[in-house]
Amino acid sequence: MGGNSIGNLFRVTTFGESHGKALGGIIDGVPPGMKLSEDDLQIDLNRRCPGKSLYITPRYEHDKVYILSGIFEGVTTGTSIGLLVQNKDQHSEDYQSIRDLYRPGHADYSYEKKYGMRDYRGGGRSSARETVIRVAAGAIAKKYLAYRCGIKIRGFIAQIGHIKCELKDWNQVEQNPFFCPDIDCLEALDILIRNLKKYGNSIGAKVTIIAENVPAGLGEPVFDRLDADLAHALMSINAVKGVEIGDGFAVISQLGNENRDEITSQGFLSNHAGGILGGISSGQPVIAHIALKPASSVKQPCNTVTRYGNEVEIITEGRHDICVGIRAVPIAEAMMAIVLMDHFLRNRAQCSDVK
């Protein structure tokens, strides 16, 4: 199986399955000399961690990360950083009933058609459990980017179902289980998720990620545009079905004189482009949005077939998120950090002499 790595100079490779013994990763390209500890990574892992509230999956994993290599006396050495997170709370028996069934909306059917077999326990490699290592890798990138040039990467829930959340207060994001910046939405979100849980259903979401203090010049022309790489990285997150940069699809109804970001001696007057022009960062905040589909594992019965072609009715068992968008916030932050870190190192390698 290919497709387990992302990045060029800052390269992240992950391995492991949802119900395997552990998940791990190899992070190449981390510059030497940066102070780094497991505690630095644990902060974001705890934000993503399952089982910590009634609004997300009850599967409880501590997600304790172990750094296996690449650190000496608390400082990065420049060699590969090995990461490991053990699985502790697998309930593989929950999936015995679907070992020969394809769950609609999941990767069961497509994985088996491609490989001739599949790990039916929690989706195996296709599970969002894999993203635990991405978040750890993203935490490394976040720390370096903040230390090196003051880049700050943050995300929030912009919408769950019909409830739209405005960016009113960044401080609120970490004060509630929804990563919501709009205190006026919290009661409605609580009622929505509780009702969905009661009736065994799920809902989609929109997540916004913003990177501030990104220097101008990150990104390559044509095929390696910064926004192209961001879209690739964000689309690789489980359940993501759409990515927008800046105003995204809203540009369809905008006029040219509305959409262009005018420039003065004091800087840009707007940021419809989301901080990227011609695939290269402009120095403005880099803004992206992702749309996540509702989880397909719900208690509502539906039709499917067995691997032998027999038509059957299925109700998906197991422990699942009611809204996958909630825990996607730190995952999306991590993917933006990984891309920005890679392009920062690439730009420094090629253009360090440019004044």
Swiss-Prot record:
E.C. number(s) listed in UniProt: 4.2.3.5
GO MF terms held by the record: chorismate synthase activity; FMN binding
GO biological process: amino acid biosynthetic process; aromatic amino acid family biosynthetic process; chorismate biosynthetic process
Pathway field: Metabolic intermediate biosynthesis; chorismate biosynthesis; chorismate from D-erythrose 4-phosphate and phosphoenolpyruvate: step 7/7
Keyword NADP: yes
Domain of life: Bacteria
InterPro entries per the UniProt record, alphabetical: Chorismate_synth, Chorismate_synth_AroC_sf, Chorismate_synthase_CS
Textual note on the cofactor: Reduced FMN (FMNH(2)).
Annotated positions binding FMN: R125, S126, S127, N238, A239, G278, K293, P294, A295, S296, S297, R319
Pfam families for this protein: Chorismate_synt
Subunit structure: Homotetramer.
Descriptive protein name: Chorismate synthase
Organism: Baumannia cicadellinicola subsp. Homalodisca coagulata
